[in-house]
């Protein structure tokens, strides 16, 4: 059974940093492209980026490429999202997804909530 478990979300102040993790199990993690996607409150899904199996190719949505870094550790079956310079509009549920060979998201995690607030 394919399982994806995100963690690392929480409350972060504007301008701060946060690192999300996604632990994968039930499949050969090292063979698959992986992706991060987010959904802000009341909004649709927004693709953040994707990484190929050996980390040689990483693609980002243009507006996020200067503040988010996607990486992976195949030995630990874990995908990462390093977030920096966060703003209130980065408040969202963050999901990792295993991509199908044809590019669509075949499996999703349950998500981890990131809230950006000064309070």
Curated annotation (Swiss-Prot):
<dbReference type="GO" id="GO:0016064">
    <property type="term" value="P:immunoglobulin mediated immune response"/>
</dbReference>
<dbReference type="InterPro" id="IPR013106">
    <property type="entry name" value="Ig_V-set"/>
</dbReference>
<keyword id="KW-1064">Adaptive immunity</keyword>
<dbReference type="InterPro" id="IPR003599">
    <property type="entry name" value="Ig_sub"/>
</dbReference>
<dbReference type="InterPro" id="IPR050199">
    <property type="entry name" value="IgHV"/>
</dbReference>
<dbReference type="InterPro" id="IPR007110">
    <property type="entry name" value="Ig-like_dom"/>
</dbReference>
<dbReference type="InterPro" id="IPR036179">
    <property type="entry name" value="Ig-like_dom_sf"/>
</dbReference>
<dbReference type="InterPro" id="IPR013783">
    <property type="entry name" value="Ig-like_fold"/>
</dbReference>
<dbReference type="GO" id="GO:0005576">
    <property type="term" value="C:extracellular region"/>
</dbReference>
<dbReference type="GO" id="GO:0003823">
    <property type="term" value="F:antigen binding"/>
</dbReference>
<keyword id="KW-1280">Immunoglobulin</keyword>
<dbReference type="GO" id="GO:0019814">
    <property type="term" value="C:immunoglobulin complex"/>
</dbReference>
<feature type="domain" description="Ig-like">
    <location>
        <begin position="1"/>
        <end position="117"/>
    </location>
</feature>
<protein>
    <recommendedName>
        <fullName>Ig heavy chain V region X44</fullName>
    </recommendedName>
</protein>
<dbReference type="Pfam" id="PF07686">
    <property type="entry name" value="V-set"/>
</dbReference>
<keyword id="KW-0391">Immunity</keyword>
């Amino acid at each position: 059974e394919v399982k994806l478990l995100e963690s690392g979300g929480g409350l972060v102040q504007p301008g701060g940093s946060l690192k999300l993790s996604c632990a994968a199990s039930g499949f050969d993690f090292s063979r698959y492209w992986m992706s991060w996607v987010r959904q802000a409150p009341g909004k649709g899904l927004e693709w953040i980026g994707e990484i190929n199996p050996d980390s040689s190719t990483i693609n980002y949505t243009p507006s996020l490429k200067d503040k988010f870094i996607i990486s992976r550790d195949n030995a630990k079956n874990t995908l990462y999202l390093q977030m920096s310079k966060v703003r209130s509009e980065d408040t969202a549920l963050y999901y990792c997804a295993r991509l199908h060979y044809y590019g669509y998201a075949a499996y999703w995690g349950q998500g981890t909530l990131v809230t950006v607030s000064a309070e």
